């Protein structure tokens, strides 16, 4: 039997069961790995993949500075929150494998990146009480809570879910809540999410509600926020009541000011005078923050929207976005501008900016609410309702600020400008900090008038680190400011601000700009910020001393901040200034702030490794490792605790001992894809830890030697031409050059065999196909037959 192309496949990583959270919590012993998994009916099996569901990045707090907001009158208590309650990526792959946000060798994977307009990402297809570590790492660095989902069907409780809720209710004690809370803390989960539209459970509903209140209180001792998410279907009595309002039959579930229990996501028909009056009464009665009430918006459509979007402008409540069950409605529409991976990814990032910033991709544009739930150039965006949030405030001596504008996927992997790996990859956990406002472009620094002629976007054409970078085009004879990061970093003597860039064409006067806390609207860089001028001269200090390299090499400028040059101080925002721009096309590969040197991490300790597949692309496998640390047993251990930004993954074989770089991860378990192994019988997987400033790394820690395993043919096929026109010759062949000869059939849409071949590795259609339409390809025979739908598309020549 064969397999599909080299990527995440069934059995590579096994997720936990959604309805068995109570069993995992009861089994968990702090400091010991969970080694038992459960099916939905409670049957147990061996498990080795817990580490893929552990976050290694602590939840960072947001900070508030009204002076670096677009609307400087909007206080934090007026700033709406946003619950993005949707799936991420495809929920399952073509072979039934569980995908979600697990690392993969697929470029066209979802790299959500507009975190500054989201406060809680409820991963709709992640198990109850669990989230993939890679997703949690990306969310946590941006201050965004994450949760999985109790995906309870819309019906009476099934036995597995009844047992689960009863088990969770039984944790309503100080000891029970402590163990549950420590379990969630260790794994990096920031709340429990419920698709609560079920009948029943009244007998243990009181215990479940009490547990929620105690859990919130317990968790807030350790992190800035924690939220249990409840869908406004099942009420306090265990009945389904979609009344779209905070009525008294939800008060106990919602909780009171002295014991908040959940945030409440209201069903979609909430916009009536009576229902809104009930909401106001409910907030008064419970004493809760009105932002803990989320007015649901169904991204699938089918409901009125223009009046709801307008109503959101007047209400004190937060916004909840849902849609849909297996894939979200921003991700699903990414192929409208082309089918290539790069095109789909570019469209997806643009649509994120349409949805969360606005249709003009600049929050300075105040756009009117529209009758739409679709990302378009007319959409008013979530920035109409809230200010972009930021976590960029910590001690630079402990942790540097570094962004390479790597979103977490690509068709290659560059390391410090050198392409070390060619091939598709995806790991959301290694995503860098993205520009907070996406994109605040103004005629003045922190100004309110939009500047024209300047555009910014993510590109996958090049990268300094990873698979992407920021691309800026500018054609503006005036002045334009692109504001990148809202910060509160103290620049001390000898703090260094670095920009790394590559000029593709054109010219401009370009400067790094920033301001200081207390004088936010005043540029602080003086002449030190100049990077290059319109005459093609570069500046390492305040005077031109070099030339712009138009031969596609990365260049850099580092500014040392001192009290003597009056640059030291608390930096409140960082951006770029463009003057006299003519056809400028530039890539930004790094913006960083460092304060001194950072410790080189110790090498990881590999605990085990496993070969998963061997085919024409190489070896797939996984490797698990630990980092020495001084944390108490059972306490979360973050990468910052072990002085590590991320881990590099490697392989080597018995015939080629040179380490081969395969990718990076923030997790303490790594997926290995396509490790080179030509002619090898033994393989090792390795991992090294990279310092916080990316300047140094540990030695590579290696697994024991493993057999490369039996070679398994890949069943994917490719068509020599696409599309094919009628009566045009073409052929179909295996992508795997080592595939054994098999029988072939081409079938039309009615199932008729229109061409065949025997014992071959390809089928030639010398005279083409006479009729337009879609054709299937079948290889093999009997129980070994593999049928692929719609592989061939035939159209008229015109």
Please name every model-derived segment.
Residues 453-481:
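Short carbohydrate-recognition loop motifs
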Residues 470, 481-513, 557-563, 591:
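Extra-cytoplasmic beta-strand recognition segments
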Residues 673-697, 769-784:
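Beta-strand-rich modules
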